[in-house]
Structures are given as C-alpha cells and as structure tokens.
C-alpha cells in the first residue's frame, strides 16, 4: 500500500453551550474523512475508522498510532478483486472507506472493514494497529463493495465454546448475487485461516445468510437494505434497518421513492436463520409520522423511568432517532424525534405475530424476500418468548408498525445520533445533531423528557452515528467528518448559584453548600453531612435577617440571621458586608446567628453618595471552608436625605419629621419640641387640594388656602409668606396663619408682561421661618390671567374659561371682569346668562370659492362672533344649504359646513349667508366673496409614463381643477399622493402599480363629483435601475460630477443622489442625459469631527432617489468614498503676489488629489481676474500660467462647489526699452552669423540622435519578434497538454439538475423566478368560480383559437405579450397536453398559411417569435424534452459548461473587461503577454474551522473576488450553486500564525494608483505566497473600516514594505468580470489590461504591446482543448439513438407534422423543409439551452463563460443552416474558428433529419397516450388558477375586441361562447 502523509491535530476547543465555556479535547484530521468510532470498554482507548486510515488514540485523544488502508488499485467492476484475478477493467487508485469498526475482545484485535476489493476486512492488533491479517481469497471475505460508510452494521457474539460469531448486515448496491445483505460468519482466532468469515452454517439448501432476490431487484432496481444499528439483548440479535418500501414505491425507477424502517430479530444461536423476523418500526407525534430511522442505542432505564414504564430496572430499552416522513433517505428532513422502545414490548409484538402465523392465520408478509404471498401453515406448537423458528413459517414479516413512545421533537437541528446511560435514578440521553451540536436530555418518564443543555461541538458539521461513552461514563466521544471530540458528560461548574445549578435539570449536578459551588456529589467534601449537598431546588439555603434595614446613623445593631437547609456551622461563621467589614457571628442555641451591623466609619464607606437608601449584600462566610456560602440583601437608610415631610414619613423606614426644625431624622429624640415630631403622613403640614388657584391680573386681593397641621412659628422664628415666581421675578407676600388649617396671603396684585397669553402658570409656594416650604399636593396649580388678552371680540370673550369669570363689556367693547365694567348690569354679558349671544357677526373669509354642483364641498367660513355653538348658526352658500360639521366648529371663530347638491342646472354665484339664533339685522351677515359652481375636467397627464414602483410627480392638466375642498386622484386602483393644485393643474405622486408595467386609467374625485377621461392613460414602465457609477468617490463637500449608468432612466422625473452618514442624510441633483445615463452632483456629508481620514470616509448608505424605486436607494455601502476637501494657502503673507505677464503661478495646497482616486482628478478652475488659466495639478500644488493682462487681479479657485479666494496677483510688465538699449540691440545683430553656426551644429547633433532612435526601434522589433515566437510556441504546447488534463478533471462530476418546475419556469418566463404560477391564488369565491369557468372555456378549441388570433391582431399586443400568453396557455393546459398539442398544430398550420399568403420566404417561418404559436412550440419542447435532457443531453452540456469554466480559469481573466487568456471569443481575448504563477492555497472550510484544509489552485494575478470564487468552487464542489455561500457574502482572510489575520479586498487603502489608472488588488499585490493558509469567513458589517484598519495596523511590521510601495505596479489577474469598473472622474479602474477605448493613455503605451492578432492562436488552443466536449454535445443532440436513449417522441411527431404541412402545400424544396426543422427544434430550443445552461442546472454563468457558450451556440446555428458559408480573411474569428468543423456538423444534422424521416410514424393515439402520461406526471407542478388569472388580464384589456370576434365566428356563435365569456366577466366584476 502506498504511504500517505497525514496531519492529524489535537486541539482544546472552546465549546459554546448555554452558558458554558469549558474547553474540550478534539482530534482533527485535514486530509481524510472520519467514518466510525470504537472505544475500548476497559482501557478507554479510542479507535477511529476513516477513509484510507485507522487511528488509535489515547483516552485524551492524543494520537498513538495511525494505520494506512488505502488508496488501493481497484475497480468496482472487478469481481473477484484484482488481488485474486486479473481484471479486464482499468485499475485506478481507489479510496478505502471504513464501513465497520468493531473490537473483538476475545481475540484482542480490531476488525476494520472497508470498501475496496469488494469490501474486505483487516484484523489489526489493538496495541499498535499491526495488521494481523487481511482475508481476501474467498467469496466469503467480500462483504460488500458499496461505498456508503454508514450502510453497514455488525455485532460480535462471543461463544462459550468455539469461535465468536460476527452478525453483519450491509447494503449490497444492487449486487445481491455477490453479497448477502445479512449473514452470520465465523471469527477464527487465526487471521490467516481460510475459514475466516465463512458462514456459520451452509449446505446446498440452507445457510446463515439472507440475500435480496434478483426478482426484487429487477422490479425495484433501487432496492437495498441499509443497516443502522445492531445489538444483542438476551439470546437475540437485533438490527435496525432502512429499506425501500415496496408497498408505496412505484415500479417506475424515476418516480418518488419511499422508505420504511424495520427492526430485524434473530436468535443468536440460530445457524439457519429460521428465526428471522422483521417488523416495521416508527414513531408518531401530533398526528405526524416519523419513519426514517437515523440512529439508536440500547441502554438500561433509570429507576424513575423504569417505574414509569412499568418494567424492571434491568430491562433493556432502545432509544431511537427518527426523521419525519418516508422520503429522502440520503438527505432526511431536519424534523426529527427521539423515541423509546422497550425490548419486552418489541418481543411481545414478535411473539404474537409468530403465534398467529403458527395458527395458520394470514401470510408470511415479506414480499421483498419471498416475491409472493405464502400462507402461514397451521402447526400445533407451544410458542414461548425464546422460540427460534422451524423450517416452516419463515422468514416472517410484521403486519403493523411497532410504535415507540415519543420523548423529544426537534425541527431545526436535525437529531442524528444517540447514546444513553443511567446516572443514579435518572436516564440521561445524549443526542448529536446534523448542525454539529450535542443535546443533553433527562428522561424520567414516558412523558417527562427535559432538554437541559445544548453544546456547540463542530458548528455546521453533522455529528455522525457513532456516539460512545468512556468506560467510566464521565466523558462522551463524538465523531464528525473531520474531528473526534471528547466532552464531559456534565459541566456543573458553569452554574454559579444554587438556583441555577438545581434549576438546570442536569441530574449529575448538585449544590455543595459550604463550598458554594455546583458539582457532582462525589466532588463535594461535605456531601455526606446533613444539608451538606442539595439536589432539589427546595433544599437551597434560605436566609432571613431581622431587622432587614438599619439607619446610617446607627452602629453595632445586633442582627439576627435565621437560616434553613444549612449544614452544621459549629466550626464558626462570620458576617461580611460587601467585603468592607467582617465580624464573627455568634451561633445561638436556636440555630440562628447574631451579627453586629457595621461601625459608623464603615457605614460611611458603604453608603457615601448613595442617597436615601443603599442595598448591600450581607454574606455568611464558613470558618470551615473559608467560602462565602450564603447571603441576603440588607438596606441602610439615610433619613436626612429626605427634604420634605411627606417623603420623610412616607418612606418604608422609621424616619421622623421634626416639624419645627424642618428636618428628617431616624432618632425621634433629636426633635427639640416634643409636639413637633411627625411620624405619619396625617401629621404633615400640607396645603390641601382645592382645584386651581385663579388670580386675575391687577386685582388687589388676598388669597386664602386650606391646609392642615400648619405649625405655629415659635419664638425667634419668622412668620408665613407666599412666594410667587413669574417671568423670572420673585414676589414675597406676607401671609397670616389663621389656624392650623388655614393660611391667607395678604392683599396684593400680580402682573405679567405682554398680551401673548391669556393666562400663565405661576410658581407658587407657602413658606415659613424664611425658607421652610409647606408641602403641596402634586396637582396644585396657580394661574394668573388677563380677560382681554387674546380675546378682542365678544365671541372670543364669551368662550373663555368660565372659571375666569370674564364677560363682554358692551359699552367698552372689551373683555373684562364684572367689577371693571361700568353699570348697569346689562352692560356686561357672560356666557352663563340665558340667551347670551354676540351681535354683529362678520364673515372675513370663505374657502374654497368654487365647487362642483354635485356638492360635498366643505366650505370653511372664518370671521368673528360666529355663535357660541354650532346649533345656533344657520348657513346657505350661493343659495344652497350648507350643513354645519360640529366636530370642526371653532366657537365664535370658524364654521365648516358641507354643501348639498345644487338642483339648479346652471346655478349662479352667490355669497355665504349666516344667521346667529335668528336672522334679525344685528345677528345676520353675508360674505363679500362669492361662491361659484363649476364643472372640473382634465385632458392631459404629464409625464404620461413612469416607473411601476410609483413616485413620479404627475401634473394633470384641465380646467377648474382647484374647485371643491377635497380631491382624490386614482390611477387604476391606487391613490395618487396629492401635492398641490390650482385651477389648471393637479400635481400628485403616482402610486405603485399593482400590475407591474401596464396602462392605467385616471379618475378624479372632487368632493362628490367623479371625473374621468378615457382618452387620458398613464403608462407604468419597468423600474429604472442603476448599474454603474463613475467615479465612486467625491470630496467631503460633494458637488463633484458622477456619471451614472442604468436602465429606464428617462422615466424618472426628478432623480437625486443621496448619502447618509452618521444618521444625517444629504442629497444632490441629477440630470438625465438619455435612457441609460445621467449626470449627478455628489452629495456632501457632515463629518461631525474636524479631521477626515486621508484614506477616506464611507457613508452608511449611498444611493439614488429615483421616484419610489426602493432598490436604488442604497447601493453597496463600501463602494463610495469621501476624501478630505482640498485646501489652499494664501498668496504670500500679505495676500499679494508680484508676477510678470505669462509667468507661472504656483498655488500651494493640500489634498488636491484624493488619496485613492488614482488619476481621476478633481475638476479645478482657477480664475485670475475672472479669466480661467491653463492648469497642471499635483498633490500639493496647482501650476497656472498668469494671463497677459497687467495690474491687480483677484485669484479664485473653484472645485466641487467650493470657492477659495487666495488673494491678488500684481502683474507688472517690463518697461519699454530706452534708446541706448535699442542701439545695443542693433549692435547685437552682428552676432547673427554666430547664431547660424550654432544652428548647423544643432542639426548635426539631431541627425546623430535620429540614428540612435532607429537602432533602438530595431532592438524593440527584435524583442517583439522573439516574444511573438514564444507566445505561438506556448499556445501549441497548451493545445497538446490541456485536453487530457481537462478530461480527467471532468470524471465523476455530479450534475446539479434543476427540478422540473424550476427548469420549466426559467424557460417559459425567463428572468422571473417567483412567477405567480408557482403560488396559490388568493381570490374571492366569485372570482375563483369565474376563473374555473374561464379554464373550461379555454378547453374549447374554437374559443382559444379565436382568443389568440384576436390578440395577435391588436397593434398594442407586443412581442413580450405574445410570449407571455403562449407560456400562460401552456401552463393552463399542462393537465391536457394532448389537447394543447392539437391546438399547437392548428396554430402552426395557420401560421404557415399566413406566411405563404404574405409572400414571405418560406425559410423565414419559425425564425423569430412573432406569434403565439412560435413561443408555444418552444414551450412544448421544453415540457417534453425534460426527461431527454436529464437522461441524455444534459450530461454533455454540463460537461461542456464545466470544461469551458475550468479552461477559462486556468489562465488570467480580467476582472474589469472580462477578457481572458483562454477564450473562444475574440472580443473576450487578452491580447497581451501576462506573466502569472499558479498558487496552491489551503482553505479552511467556512462551516467548520476545525475541519480539514482544502487545497485550492489559484493564480497570483487573481483579484480577491476571483480568488474567493475559486475557493468556493473547490470547497463546495458538487454543491448546487443556490445552496452555497456567495463570494460577496464572504471575506477572504489570509492567516499568518495564530494572531495575524488579514482581510483581503479588491480595493482598500493599499490599492495602487499610477497616473490615471487605479488597479484592482490581486493576490500578488498582497504578496500571498504558495501554500498560504486562507479562510473564508462571513462578511462583517464594516469589513473594511473595522477589519482592515485593525488588522493592517497590527500586522504593519510585516507588511510595511507593501504599504510603502502601494503605488508600484503589480501583476493582477481575475477570474471573471465580476468587478464593476467604478471609475472616478478622470480615473480608470483596471486589473490586467488597461482599456484602450480611452484616448488618454500615455505616450509609449503601445510600445509595450505585441501584435494583438498573434494572440488569436490562443483561440485555436482553447478551441482544441474544448473540441471533445463540443463534439460530444453536438453528437448527442444530432443522434437518433445515443447513450442508450431513444429519440424523444415529440421530435419525431413534430418533424412529421412539418413534412405533412410541406406536402399539403406542395413545397418540394428540401432546403425549406430542412430550415423549418432547424428553426423548429435546434434554433428554438437547443440554442436557448446551450446559451443558457442555468435554465437546466443549478449553476452560475459568468460573462466569459457566456461569451464562449455564445460562440458554441453560433456554431450550432451555422451547422443547421443550408446556406453556404463564404469565409475570408476579414470574417469574424468565431466563424473562422469552426470553419473546418461546420461541414462535418452539417452532415450530422442532415443525417439526423434523414434518420428521423425514415423512422416509423407515431400514431395520434400513441402520441396522445404519451402526452396524457406526461400531463399526469406534472399535473400539480403549476397553479393553474394563477395562470388563468394572468391570462384573464388580456380578456380585460381586449374585452370588446374578443367579444366582437366571438360574434363573428360561426362556431363560437353556435356554442354561445360570447355569452359564456360575458357571464365570466360579470362574475369577476361583481367581486370588484
């Protein structure tokens, strides 16, 4: 056997449980999978079976030995194995999966059975795992070659004399001729004996084995028996099994499979298996059946459980786990249940069954084994419990299910394994779950199972079936695929109080009283003493103290502590108060303790700063153990902290109020006057409640207050005063105490300034002796008021608060008190007077002034003296009665009334008329304004289109639209949110569309008038989306430009961009350019702190307000960054700078180029004297050329909405030359000759430079030529090597087919995952009835044809509508595919006829989806070719997809452009030389940190997202894409040692910027090395802000060189174009190749490029590598019989139909027939599937894979074409690529069509039978009612046209189809 390196690890793991953090030991493997566990019952050593390994571990999980068992050269088809006979099948290294691990105690050896060589076993010495033997020479040595590790169970039965026996049950994987499913075998002491594993008994008729009959396998090919658990009890051997339920499973192999659990029993001494009996077994809970057995464990019941069950305590019981239902054996439901069986009950069922059979009753009832029903034979025989069978009446099956007792149900974790044992009187059950948890359950009765603890062991990794105890039952061993864990059975120490300990439910735990801890009884030193160890909650110590409170001024108070449930305390106890003070307690004869309270000094320490009370813990400390074992709360109170009498005597403590000293004290003797002491609230001085104290302004009056217990001031004490505080001023008024119950403030008047308030509340109190306040009730209020303030009219005066006693002084025209109004008495009016009403009402305003004549307008009338109640006011408006609305009436000021309908045809305008009481002249008025009746109309809505999510600001134009008081705008069923209106327009915000994109009518409701206009329609369109921003940064101030790409942007009326930072939201404007682009100004953010970080700030949210489209409100949080605002220095100290005209001006500043913005620059404008200047920008300065003008010019810089005034430029020109200077200049002309000489010398030098440049270019050309040669050589080498490599990788790939429903929906309704046809329809009964009638109507061919032809005739019936109707029709007819096929044929015939009549070329038929029939044809094939896809064509298509994906990912892929080194598409080919290295990273599995690391190959140039995708692809290989995590939800963590963990990201502070380009981070950028350890961890909330700043700082010393070189160029690659090129203004994002669509690449950039066409050799290399997979797919599709699959009937049937149509129309051109068939099937169905494999499989298709599949699909289309392909040097590369293959493919297509034509025709009857069966299989996959509801939409939309068409059609008239449809329409309408 080969030697394989293994890296097992021993860890201490922290277990996460309910309150527990105790570490437990683990043994972890990284490069194998663990399968089985065995624990030695004496030594406690642990043996672990695994794939290719067996381990021996010490009890503490330290590895002692490892034994290698594989891989082995083998082939599953070799029988006998290759070790015995040369095998014709190819041998490859095969993993040896351990399936059985048993300790043979008698022979001191380990039996380890595996999967290789047809299931041979090894015998290993227990001491060192030395291989004692490996029998593999006889057929008895081959147990089963099945690969499942948990499908085998075995039991060793030791014999008193002779060898032990091995009872073994196993799944046989369909090979029943080789392996028995159950057998009894000899375990010989000599491992090399030929008799080893031989059957215990065998003759020519009978043997110790059970085999699955071949007849059973021929009927049920999937039949097998999976053995879950085996055990011995008394003299019987038992097995729990799972097997196919042949009673419920249909013979059809593709149908649903049902399984049943059975218990098998045999006598241990039965050699002939005559005693074989099996019974169905299961459990039920709340009416739900649980029939999938998962695990079981045999144990003894605890005494309590035994008593509850009524069985002896030594009886065996079986704890069993079942999953719900009978389906999904391999992946059972997580709904599981723990059940209990007693062996006596099971044996009783079996005994009764045997007895009934021996009485001749019934049959043997074992159809899978006997293949027929054999009757029981009546045999007079006494059957007892130990009966072991005869040759007759066997084997025997049970007739009913043995039901267990349900104990515990779980619906989330998925219980998977179980173990149990007895502790004291309790049964304790341990359960492992599929989510990696351990559950602990106490079972004390059949109805008493308590889950008391859950421990997280291996998060997310299932606990396997083997769950075993250590010999002393102190630990339990759990097994998962990568880890063995040793956990203590109890963690009592986690509970810190007696209540928590004894309330936990853990039977192991009790409370050790004097040790004050939770532990086992044996761990408690004083447990044997009375009350030393508590096991019941009621036995916890209870402590009371008398007194339970003491004043802070009292010390040394003797406290008596009474206790219950305490042990002997004679050794001594001390008392302590929060460790501040401790004193020894005196033990009283009564058993109580006596403790002193703390001293005054100690009390100050305890209570300082704690106010009136402070609760501390009085603790009792045992002198025996030195432990504080009990405590009780104790209160110290401080009376002096209470400042009022009521709070003092009302406290729960003995506080006393000293009335004359105004203090609270705990000592009554401290009161200086005996009569001044108060000890109850009744004795407190207090102002009594008497309602509000009302004080009119300016009135001199005394204030008398009722009180009680008012103290009489003593000698030397001051008298009473009233203290009033108003508007910040304090007034003290002398007061007189009449007696103890009355006090009066002396005459005084009170004022407050201003008339803004009619009254104001005063701060009013009564004090004595200067500052002793008398207590007031909480409700006491004093109000100071002015009658005239805010009451200028009679009406306002009379509605004043009656308590103020204000009235209207008629002569003074003023609101006054009665005393202030001159006589006579009638001159003063008060509301209490009978008939009081104000004269001279006046209307100042009415609103609105117009309304509809239908009435309903609420008219608001404002004025004065408008009555005191609404009942006394009468109203008419424009001569029409207006009814007052009492709830909106404001006394004297405002009346709101509702207009009745005007019955006059054209009512004239008129005033509002009002009477108060009667209509006499003094009490009547009318308005100056006139009210008019109008007729509002509207004729236009603008805009007429908007997104379906609503939010569009609509303007509805018309006339008189401001009429009335209320307006409601309804768009179909939704209310448009009102904004404003005027006479010509109403503005409102559109609601969300309930129908999605659609046309909707508009209705206005103005009061009681309803206005509509059928000519005005509002159209809901698709919601706009935002797909890309450029750039993704701004400055703090915002206002920089952002270019936004998206879809449907023109439908947005007022788009805005928004940012939210620290709870503050800001927005800015956007301008839509076209439907896919808009330009926005970035919003600024408010930092809240002075200095932003240089690396930028990320807003909490960043997105767009696109009307009400929610999806755009918040984009990816981390993608937008705000950098610090630029700042500038002034022009010199004085602000003035002197320069010459045209010279450079340097403007210095900071943050001029944002830190991570690359070459995307801020747009600076520098104005000098108002004129812009040319700029050069660097990080710290702007270089500007000064203008030509002179003088003082102001300098201003504009950037991103910021303006900087830097100072003034003083531009001074040189003065004109003087005459001597001019003479000197002329004299210099003599030097001209010298200048000419200089020019000649320069020319010579230039010539030499040109020669040197020529040589340099020649050298570059030579270098380029060598690189081209190397590239071509590499491409050729890759072509030769990649094919085999790719083929090997594809072997064994699992195909993640989508289920039929999902597949069909994706093809029928592309892009709509949750289509209504998948959901139940919630409708009123009438509508449901109508839809069912509509469904019946669809089954009338005349109606359906008329319906479809009518829809197609409508100009507004779009292409999309045609596809939708076709798909909905097929769904609605899913249950009648035979009828749908006939309809489809008729529609196709009509289409052919129409095509020929319109003189179109016949070849154009079925080319596009311009009719319902064409889409129906696609859907028809979709339904009927699903099985062919799954069984035949799906495999090559999936392998092609995988091959393309893997081949693309072998080389670099640009994350921005999507270009790749390997590609079939020229458009997606990298045309540069990219240097890269392959790295192998070791990835920690996301679900389980402790599991084995997975090696993953990546490229050092991969972007981080690409690396994450490759890691996920490898870690979750074989897992459907929808069931695995997504890269965007995970962070990539690079781990260096224990502490250093770095989060890698595509962009962070180290992102490199070079000139105008910002480069995406790659693995090479982070300097990740080969062999590095990485982990995928769930993405954190702030993955960059938190993780990066922390991790990079911590690891700076290691990576400081990386950070310093953050701008150096590095090699980066990508896997797929998954990064959006988020670009800033002027900055381009790049990964591997700079996008040269930009025109601003640097000079010389092209100099580094090779001739791009050279790289087209890569296309050929990639094409050659993938050729096999393309050929396989085409061959499968274009073969009539391939891979054992016959041609689908649908293809032959449809091709024959097309030939019939051609014959009927005398079309003899073979090219036309060929084209019809190509358009019908390959182009309509296969091309769609090839381009969109995600329709068939649960996968993700990236852009490079899509591009390559498009090339394959184009080749497929070209292969089906009859036209000649004329290719030249200018033809597209994808045409040239397959140019030589297409003729061959064309021949395949022609042969395929010929072969189909030669096949026997399918009769309509046979086809109908096939279609009926297909309908039955998928009858319930879709909700037909929902489909009918969707179809009915088109009836509503084109109702009149359809009804008209039904009238015109004779057949429809004959069957009265119009009336039937109208009946349906009526039914629907009646429910709306």
UniProtKB/Swiss-Prot annotation:
Q: What is its main location?
A: membrane
Instruction: Report the subcellular localization.
Output: Cell membrane
Q: Which CDD domains match?
A: IPT_PCSR, IPT_plexin_repeat1, IPT_plexin_repeat2, IPT_plexin_repeat3, RasGAP_plexin_A, Sema_plexin_A3
Which residues are annotated as modified residue Phosphoserine in the UniProt record?
1597
- Could you list this entry's UniProt keywords, alphabetically sorted: Cell membrane, Coiled coil, Disulfide bond, Glycoprotein, Membrane, Phosphoprotein, Receptor, Repeat, Signal, Transmembrane, Transmembrane helix
Q: GO biological process annotations for this chain's record?
A: axon extension involved in axon guidance; axon guidance; branchiomotor neuron axon guidance; facial nerve structural organization; gonadotrophin-releasing hormone neuronal migration to the hypothalamus; hippocampus development; negative chemotaxis; negative regulation of axon extension involved in axon guidance
SMART domains from the UniProt entry:
IPT, PSI, Sema
- Which domain of life does the UniProt lineage start with? Eukaryota
Q: Impact of altering residue 1300 to A? A: Almost abolishes response to semaphorin
Residues in a coiled coil are 1240-1294
A Pfam family hit: TIG_plexin
Describe the family membership recorded for this protein in Swiss-Prot or TrEMBL: Belongs to the plexin family.
The protein depicted here goes by the name: Plexin-A3
Species of the source = Mus musculus
Species classification: Eukaryota, Metazoa, Chordata, Craniata, Vertebrata
